[in-house]
């Protein structure tokens, strides 16, 4: 279910403040955030935002194609270790 149109997109206030401060500054720095639920706005394009995945902050470079998506979509929280491999003994006995 998508968000209601009348509510508009959501972005954390602290993240917006950091993005606005970054736009005023000349140096580009990585912005750390824990707000995976924030929607990416056009003003974020060209910035690098480090999104928390539960263990560490993963840097994500924002492009125009990402506008309208959530920050959490680009940083997976679960690591896939692969399926359990079969033993050689189990396959050779059958």
From Swiss-Prot:
Gene Ontology biological-process annotations: ribosomal small subunit assembly; translation
Gene3D superfamilies: 30s Ribosomal Protein S19, Chain A (3.30.860.10)
Keywords annotated in UniProt: Ribonucleoprotein, Ribosomal protein, RNA-binding, rRNA-binding
GO molecular function (one): structural constituent of ribosome
Functional note: Protein S19 forms a complex with S13 that binds strongly to the 16S ribosomal RNA.
Pfam families, alphabetized: Ribosomal_S19
HAMAP family: Ribosomal_uS19 (MF_00531)
InterPro entries to which the protein is assigned, alphabetical: Ribosomal_uS19, Ribosomal_uS19_bac-type, Ribosomal_uS19_CS, Ribosomal_uS19_SF
Domain of life from the UniProt record: Bacteria
Native organism taxonomy: Bacteria, Bacillati, Bacillota, Bacilli, Lactobacillales
Family: Belongs to the universal ribosomal protein uS19 family.
Gene Ontology CC annotation, any one: small ribosomal subunit
Organism: Lactobacillus acidophilus (strain ATCC 700396 / NCK56 / N2 / NCFM)
Protein name: Small ribosomal subunit protein uS19
PANTHER family: RIBOSOMAL PROTEIN S19P FAMILY MEMBER, SMALL RIBOSOMAL SUBUNIT PROTEIN US19M
């Amino acid at each position: 279910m998508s968000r209601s149109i009348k509510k508009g997109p959501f972005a954390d206030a602290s993240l917006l403040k950091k993005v606005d401060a970054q736009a005023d500054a000349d140096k580009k720095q990585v912005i750390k955030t824990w707000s995976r639920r924030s929607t990416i706005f056009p003003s974020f394009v060209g910035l690098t935002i480090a999104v928390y995945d539960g263990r560490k902050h993963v840097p994500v470079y924002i492009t125009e194609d990402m506008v309208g998506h959530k920050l959490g979509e680009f940083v997976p929280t679960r690591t896939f270790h692969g399926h359990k491999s079969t033993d050689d003994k189990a396959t050779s006995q059958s």
